[in-house]
């Protein structure tokens, strides 16, 4: 019978044995507990931890990448105009590069500064609408936009919806961009052009900037957009020629981008524009060479901004460029003859400060531009960069 009870009785777990051991009085157990209690009493307390000064840098995990400087940190966007634009976009099913690319200036450009009324925000707001969906056929190593070889088909109502939304906001300047659509025969050029024409029909007073891809090098498709009635044609070279194969999708080349900008100007566009990211491994000599190439083809506007890694799946930041270096590139570019230069850590290709200046040129200098041309205005305009009358 005792044997049967032993079989039926569940075995004691190690934890139970451990408790039993501690519960059994013994000189060795008491000694261990006493030493442990003494260590707790004589050791550092909570006050000792929180009274110490916090070090400037706490090492956690991978520290190979440079630390984000304080001047690159931005506040959470808010405000009446910000909420209005966001609501309209959702209602019409439209996408913005501001959201898709996680732009740090979204609160600023959408009129989300604290204290701004809806009317004040709208008058200062600039939104960058992303056409042809939110999925790109290319995979640049710096970009956070979704990618696919077979994105969804185009929305035939998008040109009308976009024009309706823009005319409703009462903005003075709008930027249209798009994902790359290498799956389409025309790269989406006709869709892009139709959107511009509808905007100009519904709100002819609005100035339109088109930030396009390279249309796989097809200059005929560049012409379709360039001759649609837009005011500014933008195409970003993104980085210097030497780094282009490592930064951009393999189908994009530096020389191909130059041809796009050059052809847009030859097609009759008043102002051409491009953007360069700093902090991806470029040298000063390479940046200067890129600027000279841009001036050879009469590009009017250039912007400089800091590359910021969207996720850990994207290429690392090589370095964070100091604001003083951005100021230096602004001066260098102006001396090379660019009509306008926006340069700063948080500047992006469609940053509103540059648009205010371009809007002033296109509106206030319309007659002069018609008679003289952009290149002849460069000298007189540079003197008034800090005092713009809208």
Curated annotation (Swiss-Prot):
Region described as Disordered: spans on this chain: 23-48
Q: What class of enzyme is it?
A: transferase
| SUPFAM superfamilies cross-referenced by the UniProt entry | Radical SAM enzymes (SSF102114)
- The organism's superkingdom is given as Eukaryota
Where is [4Fe-4S] cluster 1 annotated to bind?
Answer: 98, 103, 109, 350
Task: Tell me the compartments it is located in.
Answer: Mitochondrion
Supply one GO molecular-function term: metal ion binding
InterPro entries xref list: Aldolase_TIM (IPR013785), Elp3/MiaA/NifB-like_rSAM (IPR006638), LIAS_N (IPR031691), Lipoyl_synth (IPR003698), rSAM (IPR007197)
Pfam families cross-referenced by the UniProt entry: LIAS_N, Radical_SAM
Q: In which pathway does it act?
A: Protein modification; protein lipoylation via endogenous pathway; protein N(6)-(lipoyl)lysine from octanoyl-[acyl-carrier-protein]: step 2/2
Which residues of the sequence carry a binding annotation for [4Fe-4S] cluster 2? 136, 140, 143
Concerning its family, UniProt says: Belongs to the radical SAM superfamily. Lipoyl synthase family.
What name goes with this protein?
A: Lipoyl synthase, mitochondrial
This protein's species is Laccaria bicolor (strain S238N-H82 / ATCC MYA-4686)
């Amino acid at each position: 019978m005792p044997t049967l009870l032993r079989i039926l009785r569940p075995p004691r777990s190690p934890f139970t044995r451990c408790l039993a051991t501690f519960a059994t009085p013994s000189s060795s157990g008491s000694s261990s507990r006493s030493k442990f209690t003494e260590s707790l009493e004589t050791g550092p307390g909570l006050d000792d931890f929180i009274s110490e000064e916090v070090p400037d840098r706490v090492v956690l995990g991978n520290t190979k990448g440079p630390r984000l400087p304080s001047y690159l940190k931005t506040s959470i966007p808010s405000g009446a105009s910000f909420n209005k634009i966001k609501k309209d976009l959702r209602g019409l099913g439209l996408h913005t590069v501001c959201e898709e690319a996680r732009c740090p200036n979204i609160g600023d450009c959408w009129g989300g500064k604290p204290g701004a009324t809806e009317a004040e925000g709208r008058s200062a707001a600039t939104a960058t609408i992303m056409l042809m969906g939110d999925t790109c056929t290319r995979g640049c190593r710096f970009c956070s936009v979704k990618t696919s070889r077979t994105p969804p088909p185009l929305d035939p109502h998008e040109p009308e919806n976009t024009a309706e939304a823009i005319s409703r906001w009462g903005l003075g300047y709008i930027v249209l961009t798009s994902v790359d659509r290498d799956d389409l025969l025309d790269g989406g050029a006709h869709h892009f052009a139709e959107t511009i024409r509808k905007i100009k029909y519904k709100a002819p007073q609005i100035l339109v900037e088109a930030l396009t891809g390279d249309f796989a090098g097809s200059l005929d498709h560049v012409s379709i957009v360039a001759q649609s009635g837009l005011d500014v044609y933008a195409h970003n070279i993104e980085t210097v020629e030497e780094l282009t194969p490592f930064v951009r999708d393999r189908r994009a080349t530096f020389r191909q981008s130059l041809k796009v900008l050059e052809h847009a100007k030859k097609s009759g566009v008043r102002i051409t524009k491009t953007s360069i990211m700093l902090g991806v491994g470029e040298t000063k000599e390479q940046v200067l060479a890129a600027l000279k190439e841009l001036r050879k083809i009469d590009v009017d506007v250039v912007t400089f901004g800091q590359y910021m890694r969207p996720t850990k799946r994207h290429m690392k930041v090589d370095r964070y460029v100091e604001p003083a270096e951005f100021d230096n590139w602004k001066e260098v570019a102006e001396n090379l003859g660019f009509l306008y230069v926006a340069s700063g850590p948080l500047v992006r290709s469609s940053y509103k400060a540059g648009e205010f200046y371009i809007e002033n040129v296109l509106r206030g200098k319309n007659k002069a531009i018609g008679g003289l041309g952009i290149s002849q205005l460069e000298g007189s305009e540079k003197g008034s960069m800090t005092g713009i009358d809208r």
